[in-house]
């Protein structure tokens, strides 16, 4: 049975061929203006598409909600809510509308949408000016709230009747679906906060994500982006911020039937030290799971048996060890290096390698002596503390995967300095050193040498566990090995899949319990999860 939304509207499809841009509020408004002025849309048609998208998502995401209360402000966000209310009512839902302004105070397009409401629904609208004891009775039995009070044009703080409404629904059990943004949020927010905003269980935004959608932590529920008719040419961003999720498309093309392991690359994981044999083993296993054709772990002789026992599919290469059991500079002999590189496509250097001075010297010289694509992580990065100038990606492909502490050591600064402006930190280092830099943490960033930065929106606190970084290192190396001509997409895809596997884990188990290797059990699920379904792009799946 088709819902009223589908009967009444042929919703537009996405027109994006490249990465989805992340916009500021001003850029979003300019996009809407270009869509109207240059592509022949009307403001009313954009509002119709937006409201229809919200109603469609509400029907699919909250199918058991019968009594739906739609909370509308006087601006365009309220107009989107009025359109959604009309379609939900047409789909058989019991809809109640609360207006935070008198009908005659509505702006022009929202007023037009108000006039389109069926007479019975329009006549039952509750107009809220200030606290009203009748409101509680009006909202009794609500199964779902649609928050359409304030959108991208709002600037905190929130005042007036909206504050009372926020406080009223804060203690109610019914979920809240936010239209564009939870009311009270600034669309340009780049830090997590919840002060003063409506609670939210899901968010539907339009055309492209805004800064708050990727950096704000608006909800633990899903965040989706719906098309409303703006073509790609209308979406212009000066911030050069994109989203990692669209790079997942490189994994959606089936492998050729006549494929062989040689077509998918050979990864050499260089790492390990006494007590840290698990790190290169996990990276190697992750590289295999992520699709590399062959994987070899190059580790000190003393831990080779431990590493080799981790997975039967993994090959090992024994390296000469120092007096303390780490990797020795003896392995830098030209013949040894040439033998190590034979048949290898991508290097992953650093997992469990330790911080012994001799091993750090090995890492620096090894990277200087080789020209293969290389992924550097953990103590492979710490080896360049005080030597960051030697990390030069000109003439070869280098991917660095630091957490904030490792990034601070490379820069000779502090974690607080790194975290103060993560985007600028990542972008500046990537462009200066001609590397691809994966700055891990809340909303992991992938910064490219050309200045573009992709923001990742998958992942959750289950990843705050030793070994998850080693898994990511192996996945990044495997993706680069499989897609050597599409390195930017390969790295972004690996980061997205890493987080998506953790999201898949917590859908059935608790985030406290995940082991790093359990990520790999959910990797197939992450690969098969479509970026776009039900007519919307899933920026965040929710937990």
Describe each region flagged by the PLM.
Residues 143-144, 149-239:
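Internal gly/pro-rich beta-alpha loop/helix module
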Residues 2, 6-19:
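Short, Lys/Arg-enriched N-terminal segments with co-localized hydrophobic residues
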Residues 16, 83-142:
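Gly/Ser-rich phosphate-binding catalytic loop and adjacent alpha/beta segment
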Residues 133, 140-157, 347-354, 444:
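Glycine-rich phosphate-binding loop
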Residues 121, 171-174, 432-435:
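A structural motif corresponding to the C-terminal end of an alpha-helix
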Residues 10, 113-129, 235-250:
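Short coil-to-helix leader/linker segments, especially the first N-terminal amphipathic alpha-helix
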Residues 14-102, 107, 202, 211-374, ...:
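Small-residue (G/A/S/T)-rich helix-start motifs and N-terminal tracts that mark the onset
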Residues 130-133, 181-187, 211, 380-384:
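Short acidic loop-to-helix transition motifs that present clustered carboxylates
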């Amino acid at each position: 049975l088709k819902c009223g939304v589908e009967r009444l509207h042929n919703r537009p499809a996405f027109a994006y061929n490249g990465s989805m841009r992340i916009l500021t509020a001003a850029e979003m408004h300019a996009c809407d203006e270009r869509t109207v002025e240059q592509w022949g849309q009307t403001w009313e048609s954009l509002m119709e598409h937006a409201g229809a998208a919200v109603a469609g998502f509400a029907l699919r995401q909250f199918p058991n909600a019968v009594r739906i209360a739609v909370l509308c402000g006087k601006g365009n966000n309220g107009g989107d809510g009025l359109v959604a209310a009309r379609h939900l009512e047409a789909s058989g839902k019991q809809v109640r509308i609360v207006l935070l302004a008198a009908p005659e105070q509505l702006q022009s397009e929202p007023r037009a949408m108000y006039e389109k409401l069926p007479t019975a629904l329009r006549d039952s609208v509750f107009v809220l000016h200030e606290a009203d004891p009748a409101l509680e009775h009006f909202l009794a039995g609500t199964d779902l709230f649609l928050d359409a009070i304030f959108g991208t044009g709002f600037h905190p703080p929130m005042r007036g009747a909206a504050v009372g409404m926020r406080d009223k629904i804060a203690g109610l059990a019914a979920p809240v679906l936010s239209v564009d943004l939870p009311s009270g949020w600034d669309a340009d927010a780049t830090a997590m906060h919840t002060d003063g905003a409506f609670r939210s269980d899901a968010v539907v935004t339009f055309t492209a994500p805004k800064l708050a959608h990727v950096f704000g932590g608006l909800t633990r529920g899903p965040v989706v982006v719906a098309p409303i008719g703006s073509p790609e040419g209308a979406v212009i961003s000066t911030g050069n911020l994109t989203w990692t999720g669209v790079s997942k498309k490189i994994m959606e093309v089936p492998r050729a039937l006549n494929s062989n392991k040689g077509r998918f690359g050979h990864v050499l994981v260089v790492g390990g030290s006494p007590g840290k044999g698990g790190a290169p083993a996990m990276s190697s296993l992750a590289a295999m799971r992520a699709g590399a054709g062959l994987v070899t772990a190059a580790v000190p002789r003393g831990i080779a048996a431990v590493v080799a026992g981790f997975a039967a599919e993994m090959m090992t290469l024994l390296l000469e060890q120092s007096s303390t059991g780490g990797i020795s500079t003896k392995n830098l002999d030209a013949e040894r290096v040439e033998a190590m590189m034979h048949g290898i496509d991508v290097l992953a250097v650093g997992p469990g390698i330790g911080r012994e001075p001799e091993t750090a010297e090995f890492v620096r010289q090894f990277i200087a002596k080789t020209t293969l694509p290389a992924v550097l992580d953990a103590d492979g990065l710490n080896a360049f503390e005080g030597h960051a100038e030697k990390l030069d990606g000109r003439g070869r492909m280098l991917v660095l995967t630091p957490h904030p502490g490792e990034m601070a050591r490379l820069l000779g600064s502090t974690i607080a300095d790194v975290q103060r402006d993560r985007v600028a930190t990542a972008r500046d280092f990537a462009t200066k050193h001609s590397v691809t830099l994966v700055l891990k943490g809340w909303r992991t960033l992938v910064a490219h040498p050309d200045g573009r930065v992709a923001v990742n929106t998958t992942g959750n606190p289950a990843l705050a566990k030793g070994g998850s970084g080693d898994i990511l290192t192996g996945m990044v190396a495997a993706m680069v090995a499989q897609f050597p001509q599409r390195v930017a997409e390969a790295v972004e895809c690996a980061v997205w899949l890493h987080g998506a596997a953790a999201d898949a884990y917590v859908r059935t188990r608790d985030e406290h319990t995940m082991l790093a290797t359990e990520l790999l059990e959910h990797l197939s699920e992450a690969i098969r999860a479509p970026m776009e379904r039900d007519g919307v792009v899933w920026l965040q799946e929710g937990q």
